[in-house]
Design a protein with these regions (language model features):
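Adenosyl-5′-phosphate
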Residues: 1-220
Length: 220
């Protein structure tokens, strides 16, 4: 599960970052925290333990990103779906309603897939919420295809942003930092997959953000 959950695999990190960085140790530290939280609550189902881990790790990250981005724009955000009473209620609901498979074999078919590969193909997202509002909202709204907040990274890298990424990641500041595998990053920046494959482009996007963060807060 940990390997599927991660945005970037350990092998990818080793390919993108300098070999002097103790990535195995860092990965094990995170995994230890994951296991500790999973075992922290006793006498609970496997699914509720997973929910608990997500509450303590994943949700915290989402809320932090929301707070930072909204406050930067002088906006006060509210998150009613994380009201403690609603979260406690969610833990009490049988798992078969929280993860509503389309068919009996859907669970098996999706066992090694990422959530974006499962959603709406093998399950019904937010099933309980949709059922609760069936008499209040038309079906074309309730059951329309889910749309997140996609960023067309692969399209961006087909234009000026690719040149910008090269300037940032292959520049003297990035090289002097000695945390990147410049040779592999250069190969990726010249790979045609960059403007065809969103997941491939995401790795370069994350590195650009890391380097810009480093320049802003460590170099000045």
């Amino acid at each position: 599960f940990h390997n599927i959950y991660s945005y970037t695999s350990l092998l990818d990190k080793k390919a993108l970052l300098n070999s002097s960085i103790p990535l195995d140790e860092i990965e094990n530290d995170f995994l230890d925290k994951f296991i500790y939280l999973f075992n922290e609550i006793k006498n609970e189902t496997y699914y509720n333990k997973m929910m608990y881990v997500f509450e303590k790790i994943h949700l915290v990250g989402l809320l932090q990103r929301l707070d930072v981005s909204t406050m930067a724009a002088s906006v006060e955000a509210r998150v009613p779906f994380v009201d403690h009473r609603l979260v406690e209620f969610a833990f009490s609901i049988p798992f078969k309603y929280k993860m509503k498979w389309c068919e009996d074999r859907s669970k098996y078919n999706s066992r090694v897939l990422m959530s974006d590969q499962i959603s709406e193909k093998y399950d019904t997202p937010k099933y309980i919420l949709k059922k609760a509002f069936e008499n209040k909202l038309p079906n074309e709204i309730l059951y329309r295809k889910k749309l997140g907040f996609p960023v067309p990274l692969n399209n961006w890298f087909d234009g000026k942003f690719k040149k910008y990424a090269k300037t940032i990641l292959l520049g003297s500041a990035a090289k002097s930092r000695k945390i990147y595998n410049i040779r592999n990053i250069k190969k990726m920046l010249n790979n045609d997959r960059l403007h065809k494959d969103h997941d491939f482009a995401m790795k370069i996007w994350m590195l650009v953000n890391l380097e810009l963060f480093s320049q802003e807060y460590f170099d000045n």
